[in-house]
Structure formats: structure tokens, C-alpha cells
Design a protein with these regions (language model features):
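Alpha-helical segment proximal to the catalytic Tyr-Lys
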Residues: 131, 176-180
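Active-site helix of classical SDR
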Residues: 126, 163, 171
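Substrate-binding pocket helix/loop in short-chain dehydrogenase/reductase
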Residues: 102-103, 107-115
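Conserved glycine-rich cofactor-binding loop
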Residues: 18-19
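Conserved glycine-rich Rossmann-like NAD(P)H-binding loop of the short-chain dehydrogenase/reductase
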Residues: 34-48
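Residue(s) in the substrate-gating loop at a strand-loop-helix junction
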Residues: 147
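Active-site loop immediately N-terminal to the catalytic Tyr-X3-Lys motif
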Residues: 104, 152-158, 180-181
Length: 186
């Protein structure tokens, strides 16, 4: 979607945007006319490089660094950013991890890190952002990335395959809750 057709001055947060799919999404958002908040956990140099590439396209960009697996850090960083810059037009929940291991050999840490990063992050990132987006009284967009593993499972990915359907279900439920104020989720 090209932001010029909406008439909005729009900012989009992309989680996990320092490399890979998240980087590509951030750059495409800039190409489409959005300002971008580039999120990373700890790859600050790569995230700043993405932000520079966004700025080179004539858009504004800033970097936020926090671990989406925890509750406090995302809430603090996102609340402060919204207070300083205003509510986002959109959010792309892209960040995630895999720790592939056969279930009998899977450690509790491997289970927890994947579930907290992939599933809990849905809440940790979106909860501080939804009401500011609603209060804008303008359309908004939230996109969550999941995996076919969330529908059919995958050998060696019990933790990953358990987390991904939660994202799908959470997205559908939030889509119903946020439809009336004009915020769509996919």
C-alpha cells in the first residue's frame, strides 16, 4: 500500500528489522512512503544501517532496541516512543526465533526462549500499542508473521509449532476486537 493514497502521516514499527525478512519489510515500508521504527534486540549496528537506508529513501527512521520476550522492556520502550512521537499507524510483528531440537532432548530453556519470543511477544509488543492506535481515531494496520508450522507442525520444532498457532489465534481475536475502530489485523 502506498501511504500517499491514504493521506496519512504514518509511522510503522517493524520488529526484528535489523536483518532478513524484517529488514526487507522495513525497506519496503519506506519505499511505500512510511516512516519506520526499526526494532532489534541487540544488533544495533545492523539496525542503524537499516534506518540509514530508510532515511536514504526520504523517510524518517529511528531504532528501538529491546528483547520482545520480556514484559517490562517492550512496554517501557514502546510507551516512551509513543509518548515522544505519537501513536503508530501500523505494526509488523516479524521478530521470532527457532531452536530446533527433538522434543525428548529439548531443554526447558529451548522451550521457553521460543515460546516467549514467538508467542509472548504478540502480547508484549501489541499490548502497549493498541490503545494509542485506537485513540488516533484513524485507520491502522497490524501484521503478524507466523508459520505453516503453526498449522501442521514440523519435526524437531515442537516448541516453535506450539507457539505459532497462538499468534494465528491472537491475530484473529484482535482482528475482531479492533475492527470497529478501523484497525485491521492480518
Amino acid at each position: 500500500m502506498n501511504v500517499d493514497s491514504t493521506g496519512l502521516d504514518a509511522t510503522v514499527l517493524v520488529t526484528g528489522a535489523s536483518r532478513g525478512i524484517g529488514k526487507a519489510i522495513a525497506l519496503r515500508a519506506a519505499q511505500d512512503g512510511f516512516d519506520v521504527v526499526v526494532h532489534c534486540r541487540n544488533r544495533l549496528n545492523e539496525a542503524e544501517s537499516v534506518a540509514e537506508q530508510v532515511r536514504a529513501q526520504g523517510r524518517q527512521a529511528r531504532v528501538l532496541a529491546f528483547d520482545i520476550a520480556g514484559r517490562e522492556a517492550p512496554a517501557a520502550a514502546l510507551t516512551a516512543d509513543v509518548e515522544a512521537h505519537g501513536a503508530y499507524y501500523g505494526v509488523v510483528c516479524n521478530a521470532g526465533i527457532a531452536r530446533d531440537t527433538a522434543f525428548p532432548a529439548m531443554t526447558g530453556e529451548e522451550w521457553d526462549s521460543v515460546v516467549h519470543t514467538n508467542l509472548d511477544a504478540f502480547y508484549n509488543v501489541l499490548n502497549p500499542l493498541v490503545m494509542p492506535m485506537v485513540r488516533r481515531r484513524k485507520p491502522g494496520r497490524i501484521v503478524t508473521l507466523s508459520s505453516v508450522s503453526g498449522l501442521v507442525g514440523n519435526r524437531g520444532q515442537t516448541n516453535y509449532s506450539a507457539a505459532k498457532p497462538g499468534i494465528i489465534g491472537g491475530t484473529k481475536a484482535q482482528g475482531l476486537e479492533l475492527a470497529k475502530p478501523g484497525i485491521t489485523l492480518n
